[in-house]
Amino acid sequence: MESPHSILKKVFGYDSFRPGQEEIVSRLLAGQDVLAVMPTGAGKSICYQVPALLLPGITIVVSPLVSLMKDQVGALVQAGVAAAFLNNSLTDNQKALMLRRAREGWYKIIYVAPERLEMPGFQRFAQEWEISMVTVDEAHCISQWGQDFRPSYLRIKAFVDSLPKRPVVGAFTATATAHVREDIRTHLELHTPYEVTTSFDRPNLYFATRRALPSEKPKVLLDLVLRERDNAGIIYCSTTRQVDETTRLLQSRGIRAAAYHAKLDADTRRQNQDDFLYDRVQIMVATNAFGMGIDKPNVRFVIHYNMPKDLESYYQEAGRAGRDGEPARCTLLYSGTDVRTIRFFIDKEMEADNGLPADVKAEAARKAEERLKYMTFYSTTPRCLRGYLLSYFGEAAPQKCENCSNCLLAAQAAEQVEEQAAQARQRAAASAKRLASASRRRADEDALSEADEKLLAALYALRKRLAAKQKLPAYMVFNDSTLRQMALKKPLSVEELLNIPGVGEKKAARYGQEFLGTIEDMVSSR
């Protein structure tokens, strides 16, 4: 009989769970509802994907964005999991085919938008089949206290109640204050849930803040981007105009950049997002419309060109860097103009004719102002930035982390901070071992030799060819950390390859011979 550990190894290629994952999996398998708050990159999806493959029926994953569904399902299919998504990106014929296959038992995991739960065709399907688990991803969207409130999330409970047999319910989010957690419990009506908040600490991330006048920001931004060379990155701007101007600035300097915001048509947004995911462009310049659920693991830097509206948004967006556990850099540029822009948007929401009572809108504006206050404090505080973030999310925080701009400034003159970034990244790599098992982190002795670097380059090239042939993002073949481990360990058999973190049985069967062949050729030619 399969166990959670055997599924983790066989399907996903990992020997052990990360902190917090195994207990969540066990509780869901035992039929207990779960409310899990885990930072971006902590492995939330494993927590519901593993039990989904062990429970008898189908798991429905409620997800807010088409891009998130496509990304998650693509990765699952590559790992050999029978998964599908149902949303408006499909034609009517494709939707009908997907539902027919679901009725025939093709799938174990189905991703849907919350609005889909109310549609008669899907409701009929849900009545006919055993739904073992309903997973609510990005669960903070259910709360008016949250930064991404979506009224459609409030109707998830009605769908669960309508099922012939109540499934176990798992709610997952990356950022949730006490108010948001209470809303999640109440609006989903979780039954005596197991609640867990794993550490928000991301030791591999270097945090920096820089005050810059609007006229100074273009030069500061270019300096930061040029230091990153060919690394993948995301630049967040507060307005569509700023996104377009910044994209043109980068492109004028020969930097491969693309834009993403709501005023672009759907086809352009989709093309630009794919170009970023498939490594055809280096940098995505975007409003906060981009990124929720994007699982590109090798983003090495995130720059906020403008201050976000709150720390929840900032930490979620910054957390899209370094999801592979490797060192990454998160920089916030801010000025007084940013605060005025955010207040303009708050006032605009107050004046909007959205059908909400005046007292409700006034309370929402008050909450937004409160969150903005803490965001402003973060931008200007002289204390440890990591400590400030962890304290805000209710976690014990160190007085200094030695891996943020403020901690470096405490010991060095301001003009030396950027020169110390490389050393900060090395410290981040070492401290990242605290976040996950050693098998998923680069140990000090794991430095690549010159020959290993050549092998790694050959593995990257092979991955790129295989991904292009299948029209997949490269990381869906194997992520960077897995290729690095191949270059270090140099497996020469399928058995040895399966010992590399991130290599499951299906991927070994699909890609193993080609990667083993490349390794053997490079090793024998030395």
Regions found by a protein language model. Give the residues of each.
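Accessory DNA-binding and partner-docking regions appended to nucleic-acid-acting proteins
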Residues: M1-P4, R340-T341, I346-K361, K367-L372, ...
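Helicase motor core with emphasis on the C-terminal RecA-like subdomain
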Residues: E2-V11, D15-P19, E23-S45, A52-L55, ...
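Short alpha-helical "packing" element that flanks the helix-turn-helix/winged-helix DNA-binding module
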Residues: Q21-I24, M375, L483
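Short alpha-helical segment immediately N-terminal to, or the first helix within
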Residues: R27, H304, Y378, Q485-M486
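Aromatic/hydrophobic pocket-lining residues that form π-stacking "cages" and hydrophobic walls in ligand
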Residues: Y48, E317, M375, L459, ...
